[in-house]
UniProtKB/Swiss-Prot annotation:
HAMAP family: TolB. NCBIfam families: propeller_TolB. GO terms for biological process: cell division; protein import. Residues 1-21 form the signal peptide. This is Tol-Pal system protein TolB. The gene is tolB. It is found in: Periplasm. Belongs to the TolB family. Keywords: Cell cycle, Cell division, Periplasm, Signal. Part of the Tol-Pal system, which plays a role in outer membrane invagination during cell division and is important for maintaining outer membrane integrity. The keyword Amino-acid biosynthesis does not apply. GO terms for cellular component: periplasmic space. The Tol-Pal system is composed of five core proteins: the inner membrane proteins TolA, TolQ and TolR, the periplasmic protein TolB and the outer membrane protein Pal. They form a network linking the inner and outer membranes and the peptidoglycan layer. InterPro entries: 6-blade_b-propeller_TolB-like, PD40, Tol-Pal_TolB, TolB_N.
Length: 432
């Protein structure tokens, strides 16, 4: 392993609005089975010609990204109803659409906005969702649109939507011939990006706390790897692991009381657990091999990690109460970088099969499916509802992020205008 010694340290904490552009999204594939939904442009009552945000466009893109739904082309809408009484149900039936979204945006006297949504089941001829938000600032209009998407998704699937969530990732840019790393947080669609830390040295492996208030990540700011705990409000930042050798791969326990991490302070790279209150360590693996990238099962009773103890990287599970260990990946010679679905049923991993792709193992029936066709895929992370997987990939020699829906063939690619994106981590649910 090549040893790199850094002699120049430079890092900046950032809490203001991002000076960088948001991520841009490209829908690479679409699902033939996506259910059409009519999204009627919202009625606008305000001083300007158009509302500050196109709510239906945001909702439409959210639903398209799920792989389950698609918006009817606006030009094909037979009418633009504002109330339930305006709807000609026979007319919409001829279009083959079962659901319709309509609403209103009203500019309030103090410069904030009131947003109303009505979601209609055209078959039952009734409104199934009615919601109003008042006192909404311009900066929060996109968040309200994501909340609408969540409500619609849950109404139609029975599964809570995960559009009103955030993701953390690392960007790498060349600034005056030198690499600049930035740890950033953005909405699930790549908008509203905010830099958390900017450094001239690498930043890796961000991991969200279960309450969404902190990030643990790996920094090299003191010339060697160390694990940092940082609050998103900028009020606290602590170095919690700076042992000799490797300090890496932090992962929060489901209750937020512990952190799994990889350390080599005792020789080989092994998985440890740190009590976040006492900072005491428990060594979980003892092997000459490299044991790393541990993630917690949702019940907190076991961890999944990758190890090359059999000669090639494979995924193992270790139970905390007994120390029992078992191998779970058997398809192919290379499986690494595990991620666990929120219900504990699926393990996503990087699988080598003529390239590195994201695959999913069903722990219930042992079905193994390769989900992606992109290049040099790594770092899978599930959405909070388990319906989508965010991961890093390479396109044209540039690092980008991508999201694949678990049960369809829809892939979206997220990139920055300049530089690369890597090390994604999908955050927990935000308050409804």
């Amino acid at each position: 392993m090549k040893k790199v010694i850094y002699t120049i340290v430079g890092f900046v904490f950032m809490w203001s609005t991002s000076v960088y552009a948001d991520l841009t999204i490209q829908i690479d594939q679409s699902s033939d089975n996506a259910v059409p939904i009519a999204l009627v442009p919202f009625e606008w009552k305000g001083a300007q010609l158009h509302p500050p945000q196109n709510i239906t466009s945001i909702v439409g893109n959210d639903l398209l990204r799920s792989g389950k739904f698609k918006a009817v082309d606006e030009a094909k809408l037979p009418s633009r109803p504002k109330t339930l009484d305006d709807i000609d149900f026979y007319q919409w039936k001829q279009l083959g659409v079962d659901n319709l979204l309509m609403g209103r945006i009203t500019e309030e006297a103090n410069g904030t906005y009131q947003i109303e949504m009505r979601f209609v089941d055209l078959l039952r001829k009734e409104q199934v969702i009615g919601k109003r938000w008042s006192g909404i600032s311009k900066s929060l209009l996109r968040q309200v649109a994501h909340k609408m998407s969540d409500l619609i998704y849950e109404e139609l699937t029975g599964i809570r939507g995960a559009f009103n969530t955030r993701m953390a990732y690392v960007t790498v840019r060349n600034v005056k011939g030198k690499k600049q790393y930035s740890l950033e947080v953005a909405d699930s669609d790549g908008y509203n990006s905010q830099p958390i830390l900017r450094s001239s040295l690498p930043i890796m492996s961000p991991s969200w706390s279960p309450d969404g208030q902190h990030l643990a990540y790996v920094s090299f700011e003191n010339g060697r790897s160390q694990i940092v705990l940082q609050s998103l409000d900028g009020k606290s930042r602590q170095i919690i692991a700076k042992f000799k050798g490797i300090n890496g791969a932090p992962a929060w326990s489901p209750d937020g009381k512990k952190l799994a991490l990889t350390l080599s302070k005792d020789g080989s790279a092994d998985v440890y657990i740190m009590d976040m209150k006492t900072r005491k360590l428990r060594r979980l693996t003892r092997n000459w091999a490299i044991e790393t990238e541990a993630v917690w099962a949702p019940n907190g009773h076991s961890l999944f990690f990758n190890s090359d103890r059999r000669g090639q990287p494979q995924i193992f599970q270790v139970f905390l109460d007994t120390g029992e260990m078992r191998r779970i990946s058997y398809v192919g010679r290379y499986n690494a970088n595990p991620a666990i679905s929120p219900d504990g049923r699926y393990v996503a991993m990087v699988h080598a099969n003529g390239g590195f792709h994201i695959a999913v193992l069903d722990l219930y029936n042992e079905d193994f499916n390769i989900l992606t066709k992109t290049y040099l895929d790594e770092s899978p992370t599930f959405s909070p509802n388990g319906e989508m997987i965010l991961y890093a990939m390479n396109q044209g020699g540039q690092g980008k992020l991508a999201v694949v829906s678990v049960n369809s063939n829809v892939t979206q690619i997220l990139s920055v205008q300049e530089g690369e994106v890597r090390s994604p981590s999908w955050g927990p649910y935000l308050p409804r």
